[in-house]
Structure formats: structure tokens, C-alpha cells
Amino acid sequence: MLIACETAIDDGKQISRQSRRDKEFPFQNWFKARLEERKIYFDEPGRNMYPDFRLVHMPLGYELKGLGYPGRVNDYDCNSQIPHGVYRGREIIYVFGRYPANPDENSYGVYDLVLCHGSFLNADNSYVHKNKSVRGMGSFGDLLLRDRKMYVAPTPFGLLDGVERQMTSILPAAWAVSDSLIPVGELVRTETDRLMTGYYFDLTTSKLQATYTENPSAGQQHHFIAYRSSRQPAVTLRQEEDR
């Protein structure tokens, strides 16, 4: 899909929106057209579906994340779904695309694109999001308190150098890829020493405190390769203090 997207951009195929208020789906529709051009069949996306595009003939899905530029690009709101490399048996590829934040016209181009395997963002596939609630809040004890967790994750633009104004794919090093893709960087992410296992929120002080446990996979390295259709520039992982 990297080549398909790059070809479309080179051919001047732009994102189209119905109006200025149409912000959620234009980039998703642009990518949908690339799938259709390649005759790649998928389940029709829905508002609360994850990932956005679930392929029919292979266990693969694409999750789209459009980023207006200039604007917030180093991280994004995952809402109620943390990044996954594998979800319900499907490998998940995140598609991060940057485009003008406030275009004057209803058709506009894609600045750059990163197709990123979800495990580059989060290697743990075991966590399952659930909303919970407890009743008993308020003066009369009959208010329901809902625990609806929301998540924020880094984007490849926040983690990497060398991806601006480029078309890049970040895949596990063990994956076989097309001969048309050229490696432009070897990336290693190392698991943290501890894992968050819970949190406590004090309603009287509004203080939020996390609880942790030792990570049994602490120090384990996960290897990825950055690919492009051309060699320049190289892609490198930013130092943590520079993110």
C-alpha cells in the first residue's frame, strides 16, 4: 500500500471533503480509494469499528490517523483503543497522514505518510479495554460513576527523525517485503522496566496515581525496519529526551 499511496500522491490525487465541517472522513476516504484501485477487498468501515479497514482475504487491518499540519503531530488521541500490533487475529497497520490543517479549498494534498505496524507503538497485545461503572456517588448515593478510559499514544512523527515530507513504511524486521521497497533504517524499541497495572483517583483531591509492577519482558528488544521506494533520507529513532 505504500507504493499505491505514493503513486496516488505523485499523480495529484488529493483528499476531497464535502465542506469545512467534514473533518473525520476525508483522509479515510482517500485511503479507501487506494484500496479500491488495487482491488483489495475490505469490510465497509463504520464509526466505531476497529481497525477502520478489515481486509477480507487476509488477516490484516488498517487504522487511519489523519494529522492536520501545522498542528499536533507528536502524539494522538487513541480514544478507547490503545495501539495493537495484533487485534483479534489481525495484524494492524496504522496509516498516519499529514495534510493542511486549515485548507482554503475542499481538495488538498497529502504532505507525508507513514504506514506503521502497531507493535512499533505498543508491543503488548494482551490488554483489553473495558468501560466499568460503580453506583453510590452523590449526596443520596444514587449517582453512577463511569470509568471511561482514554489513551494518548506517540505518532511515528514524534518518535522518528527522517519521516517528514516522505512516504515511509515501518514493519517488523522479520517480515518479508516487496523487492520494490528499500530499507532506509533499522529501528529498535526496548521494553520498559515496569508496567502500569492500575490507577487510583481521589475524588476529594482530584489526584490521579498509577500503580506498577515489574515487567517480565523488561529489556526485550523489538526490531523494525523503515522502508521506502528510494534511499534518502535515513530514518532514525529519536532519543527519549528529544521526543
Where are these regions (language model features)?
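Nucleic-acid endonuclease domains
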Residues: 1-51, 56, 60, 66-243
